[in-house]
A protein has these predicted regions:
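Repetitive helical segments and hydrophobic/amphipathic motifs
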Residues: 11-12
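Subset-of-secretome marker
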Residues: 24-27, 32-60, 66-69, 74-294
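Positively charged n-region of N-terminal signal peptides that target proteins for export
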Residues: 1-4, 8
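C-terminal motif of bacterial Sec signal peptides marking the signal peptidase cleavage site
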Residues: 16-19
Length: 294
């Protein structure tokens, strides 16, 4: 993902960049997520925690015969007992609240360790051509097919679950659950997010849900590129964000999933260089479809 921005800003690298990565391009099949009418969320859905609540009680300690145990002064010995209320596993899925669905998903992300799931595929592709103003626009039109090929060849196998198990109710547009018998599927759509050149890759709705590019410096340094001017005109908008995760009821881990967004790259007015090459970029735009399927 972090090579994408550098590729777009250093257009002369496209042909050489296309030569790296796997020789065989792997196609993946994604399934559109259709939300039901009652899947939309509002603030009231997440006012209370979905984690199982605990109750405590002070009780007298008894011996094997049921007699109350006393101390040296004759006072009854007591202890604090902590018990959890009904867990999600004991509650019918059809009765889960939206907060409980989100809690179950976050816990599944945390529980699912690398190597526990089948290897999937991380894919990148252009969603439309690369465009720009002036002379650079015609160059971009020619290079778009090569960029598409470069992105495809840098799509890689993965057994990594995106996200960190920290998704919040306020990040969601909608959430729903489907009972499959031995598994259940949680589907979510996530709010869009726009970042500047110095963002935190774990911050914001999309950062918490999947992860973003973050600061552009890593991408620039990786390919030896830099901005001479106009760095502040760079923005990345993450849109069409969705998650589907199938979770095993017994283990609480993710067995299959799909994570998706389109990142809309904009360079408003900047001068970028790589090695001895420099390009003036004005209103450079590219939409990149990013998908992980496990």
């Amino acid at each position: 993902m972090k090579k994408i921005l550098a590729l777009l800003m250093a257009l002369t690298l496209v042909l050489s960049f296309a030569a790296c990565g796997k020789k065989d391009v792997v196609e993946v099949t994604t399934t559109p997520i259709t939300m039901g009418a009652d899947a939309a969320v509002n603030a009231d859905d997440f006012k209370t925690t979905a984690a199982p609540e605990t109750t405590t009680a002070l009780v007298e300690v008894t011996d094997e015969s049921g007699e109350v145990v006393t101390d040296a002064s004759g006072e009854a010995v007591t202890e604090v007992i902590t018990e959890k209320t009904t867990t999600l596993a004991e509650k019918p899925i059809k009765d889960w609240t939206k907060a409980e669905m989100l809690y179950a998903y976050n816990q599944a992300v945390i529980k699912t360790e690398k190597g526990q799931i089948p290897t999937g595929q991380s894919t990148m592709k252009l969603a439309g051509g690369i465009t720009g103003d002036g002379a650079i626009g015609s160059i971009l039109e020619v290079l778009s097919p090569a960029a598409e090929k470069a992105l495809a060849k840098n799509s890689t196998p993965t057994d990594f679950i995106p996200g960190y198990g920290e998704l919040r109710g306020e990040d969601l547009k909608a959430i729903q659950i489907i009972d499959n018998g031995k598994t259940y599927t949680i589907e979510m759509t996530v709010k869009s997010q726009t970042d500047g050149p110095d963002a935190d890759d774990k911050a914001g709705p999309v950062g918490r849900a999947i992860g973003t590019l973050g600061s552009i410096e890593g991408a620039l340094k990786e390919l030896g590129a830099s901005f001479k001017s106009g760095r502040e005109t760079v923005s990345l908008t993450y849109d069409d964000v969705s998650i589907r995760a199938e979770i095993d009821k017994t283990t609480g881990t993710i067995v299959h999933g799909q994570w998706h967004y389109v990142v809309k790259v904009l360079v408003g007015d900047a001068k970028a260089s790589i090695s001895v090459l420099t390009a003036n970029l004005k209103n450079l735009r590219a939409n990149i479809d990013y998908t992980v399927v496990i």
